[in-house]
A protein has these predicted regions:
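N-terminal beta-strand motif that seeds the catalytic metal site of vicinal oxygen chelate
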Residues: 1-27, 75-77, 130
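Core segments of cupin and vicinal oxygen chelate
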Residues: 10, 17-58
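Vicinal oxygen chelate
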Residues: 13-21, 67-93, 112-117
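Short beta->alpha transition motifs characteristic of CBS
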Residues: 16, 107, 115, 127-130
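Conserved active-site tyrosine of GNAT-family acetyltransferases
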Residues: 26-30, 92, 121
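Short acidic/glycine-enriched loop/turn segments that link adjacent beta-strands
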Residues: 43-47, 107-112
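Active-site beta-strand termini and strand-to-loop segments that position acidic
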Residues: 51-55, 116-119, 129
Length: 130
């Protein structure tokens, strides 16, 4: 009888989905702030933007489909802000996002975080060591 221990996992997250009402606007926003290329895919019932996943442990997807509603409430995901999240944070407002919490030191001094609303109204965090 094989048991599954979560302590054996390399990451507790495998996929995250960010809801969008306008897939092109959302893809443009994340491409601009993260300086990445997001692959767009369209299906009859949904549109997707897939974050680069090669070499990543986690897959990120922007989703426009029934049942996907952008929200500033609920779970907050924190994107990797690289060495210094301020570089990404400086691009937020120029790309129709809104900074909610500026770069701040974590209470336990384990690094820095910031929180913003994306182009769709989702609350998203950034985290970095510096």
């Amino acid at each position: 009888n094989e048991t599954h221990k979560t302590s054996d996992m390399k990451s507790f997250i495998s996929i995250f989905e960010i809801p969008a009402t306008d897939i092109s606007r959302a893809v443009d926003f994340y491409q601009a702030i993260l300086d990445i290329n997001i692959e767009k895919m369209e299906f009859p019932e949904m549109q997707m933007g897939i974050f680069p996943y090669e070499g990543q442990m986690i897959t990120g997807v922007i989703m426009k489909a029934e049942g996907y509603k952008p929200s500033a409430e609920g779970v907050t995901i924190y994107l990797n802000g690289g060495d210094n999240l301020q570089i990404i944070l400086d691009k937020i407002e120029d790309n129709d996002g809104k900074i909610i919490v500026p770069k701040s030191l974590h209470a336990d001094e384990s690094g820095y975080y910031a929180i913003f609303l994306d182009s769709e109204g989702n609350k998203i965090g950034l985290h970095s060591p510096n």
